[in-house]
Amino acid sequence: MSSPYGKVDEREHVRLEARRKTRKNIAIIAVSLVILAGIVIGAVFGTMAHKKSPETVETNNNGDSISVSVKAVCDVTLHKEKCFETLGSAPNASSLNPEELFRYAVKITIAEVSKAINAFSSSLGDEKNNITMNACAELLDLTIDNLNNTLTSSSNGDVTVPELVDDLRTWLSSAGTYQRTCVETLAPDMRPFGESHLKNSTELTSNALAIITWLGKIADSFKLRRRLLTTADVEVDFHAGRRLLQSTDLRKVADIVVAKDGSGKYRTIKRALQDVPEKSEKRTIIYVKKGVYFENVKVEKKMWNVIVVGDGESKSIVSGRLNVIDGTPTFKTATFAVFGKGFMARDMGFINTAGPSKHQAVALMVSADLTAFYRCTMNAYQDTLYVHAQRQFYRECTIIGTVDFIFGNSASVLQSCRILPRRPMKGQQNTITAQGRTDPNMNTGISIHRCNISPLGDLTDVMTFLGRPWKNFSTTVIMDSYLHGFIDRKGWLPWTGDSAPDTIFYGEYKNTGPGASTKNRVKWKGLRFLSTKEANRFTVKPFIDGGRWLPATKVPFRSGL
């Protein structure tokens, strides 16, 4: 069946094709400039610091000389010793430029992850450990996919330099997230095993991320972002997208119809997904008729560009009840889990009915790049919405929960959403967010923009906080949102103790409502009351590169503040 987007996409394609060809050539030249700049900077700083010939400024543990490029690259990493050890021993290291060193670093990381996979595969034991080990195997497989993405895309000239850097940082951030999730998924007695086998690959992933972040800053210093990424580069009428979405009924042009009463092609969503072609660039539209579908659904990583559209967020509902207390790892509890890139859901509800006593029980988990959710509901208690990894956008959605009910380590923007804390278990307090950034060079965080945060029911006797820092570099901002008076005046809660790491980034900007006063907020170094310039970093266009991919989804969005 023909796609409702065909005519619009074709028109945009024709309009942009000539510009893309020009941009491709410019981007290739720009990448070369970045590489050249890296060599020059490495040579200058290396020579100044050591007063030696620019060819050799350092030696490794074996007494071998290290080139200025290796020195420059490794100096920006968090694990310098590991960097010198791996890159310094690269074949012809002295003749490699920073881009070649970056690619070599990624290849070594892939080799280390492969070793870890073999170690996990050979350590399967009792049934409980097998569940977590299999989860780790899946996560490490995703890690390798993302590392391979960096190798296949780093020479692709069909994007601007800033877009290229953002892609690479996203995939490397996700690779780090998947490895961390693997360790956290293991039973406590197995975590030392996981940490020891993933130590090398985790450090190498961090180093590769640091290198590409550094090269991105060099690109900025050459003003490449300003030249190559301007509003003229993407001539898209966002309001036209809104009109098309409102005027086009995707249900009438669906490729597959799911209905509990048998009036569709299939009775379950899981069965419908089996018809999705692998890695297809064409949209596959699945219409889910009204009803409650009791199934745990997984959109596999090879299921690209799937649209799931329902009859309404309170009418077409996917319901599950997997939870941690009954023996399922958090990563596997999701009622609806998304791993296929380019996924979109509209007018759907996702519920986990396990209840508060079952603790972690995810309604929706998203671990796929370039995903959008429009007019959807995610309803559970603890850990409702798992924004696990990659770039994600939520528009006019409703998220209901109690403890850490928006959590994960993706780059996510929630815009014009309703966020509704509900009554938790007796003795619990509500925390809306728990962001999981573990590395300063990751480009991840949770951005809550123009949302309404209000209680679901009477919560006057329940302490409710905007969030707590799950990891040392936790990054969360709340901007231009309405905050009901039930929000505790301190605003934020420590994960442990009475403070938070200085390295977190929590921000508030121009919020309104009785809960928005910052007068009595916690006095943390990492809590900032943002300027307009700072807040703009966390809007759709710069934070999730939304101007590049959201227009094609036809989901309405605000690109800036």
Curated annotation (Swiss-Prot):
The record marks Q382 as: Transition state stabilizer. Glycans are attached at N92, N130, N148, N200, N472. It is found in: Membrane. InterPro entries: Invertase/methylesterase_inhib (IPR035513), Pectin_lyas_fold (IPR012334), Pectin_lyase_fold/virulence (IPR011050), Pectinesterase_Asp_AS (IPR033131), Pectinesterase_cat (IPR000070), Pectinesterase_inhib_dom (IPR006501). GO terms for biological process: cell wall modification; pectin catabolic process. Pathway: Glycan metabolism; pectin degradation; 2-dehydro-3-deoxy-D-gluconate from pectin: step 1/5. The chain crosses the membrane at residues 26-46. Residues 64-211 are annotated as: Pectinesterase inhibitor 24. One of its GO terms (molecular function) is pectinesterase activity. Its main location: membrane. One of its GO terms (cellular component) is membrane. Substrate binds at T330, Q360, R468, W470. Pfam families: Pectinesterase, PMEI. It catalyses: [(1->4)-alpha-D-galacturonosyl methyl ester](n) + n H2O = [(1->4)-alpha-D-galacturonosyl](n) + n methanol + n H(+). Keywords: Aspartyl esterase, Disulfide bond, Glycoprotein, Hydrolase, Membrane, Transmembrane, Transmembrane helix. PANTHER family: PECTINESTERASE. The PMEI region may act as an autoinhibitory domain and prevent untimely PME activity during transport. In the N-terminal section; belongs to the PMEI family. NCBIfam families: PME_inhib. This is Putative pectinesterase/pectinesterase inhibitor 24. It comes from Arabidopsis thaliana.
